[in-house]
């Protein structure tokens, strides 16, 4: 579902395809509810090894991240820092991962490409980016770590299933229509760059 609060658009898990239909690339949103860290090795286990992911991420969100966790008593944990990792490393797995798990929101750093865009378009999900360099601030939005699965992978790769409140800001980089904010902007930026090079090179001959 979607909530509006103090001018913020907040996605609340579980998220449906209907919830995402009016969200466009470039929009700024926030996330409340279930968010599970899930990066390289977890993607490999699901896609290459065919293992069932032990956290139900269907209609929920994953975060490409390797957080810093503080162990507490009674098998409980505290989120210390949770900065995003580069999403492009998961590009080769993301289509099959989305198809298999039914995840609805993918949070990461930087853009993704054709396979992820196809998954967003076909299965009704989105990719969003959270600003890098704000890992401690992002951790404040984690209210509780509810589960920790695949602990054999070590702290960065463990599936940390968190309950978050207004996690963000998140910039929509791929929407559920498959439009890609980073790729579309590259075309526009390169066009402007070429135009400026032509103008400058007419005055400064050694450029071309």
Which residues are covered by each model-predicted region?
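Short, Lys/Arg-enriched, disordered terminal segments
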Residues: 1-6, 208
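C-terminal binding/interaction regions
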Residues: 140-208
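Short, structured beta-strand/loop micro-motifs enriched in basic residues and often containing a Trp
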Residues: 5-15
């Amino acid at each position: 579902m979607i909530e509006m609060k103090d001018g913020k658009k907040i996605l609340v898990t579980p998220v449906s395809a209907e919830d995402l239909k009016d969200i466009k690339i470039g929009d700024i949103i926030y996330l409340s509810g279930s968010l599970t860290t899930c990066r390289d090795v977890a993607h490999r286990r699901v896609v290459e090894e065919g293992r069932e992911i032990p956290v139900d991420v269907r209609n929920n969100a994953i975060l490409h991240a390797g957080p810093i966790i503080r162990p507490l008593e009674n098998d409980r944990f505290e989120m210390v820092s949770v900065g995003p990792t580069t999403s492009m490393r998961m590009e080769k797995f993301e289509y099959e991962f989305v198809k298999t798990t039914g995840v609805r929101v993918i949070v990461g750093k930087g853009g993704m490409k054709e396979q992820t865009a196809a998954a967003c378009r076909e299965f009704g999900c989105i990719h969003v980016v959270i600003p890098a360099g704000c890992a401690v601030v992002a951790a404040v939005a984690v209210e509780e770590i509810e589960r920790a699965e695949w602990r054999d992978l070590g702290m960065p790769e463990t599936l940390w299933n968190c309950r978050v409140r207004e996690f963000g800001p998140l910039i929509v980089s791929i929407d559920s229509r498959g439009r890609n904010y980073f790729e579309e902007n590259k075309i526009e930026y390169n066009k402007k760059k070429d135009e400026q090079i032509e103008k400058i090179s007419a005055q400064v001959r050694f450029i071309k």
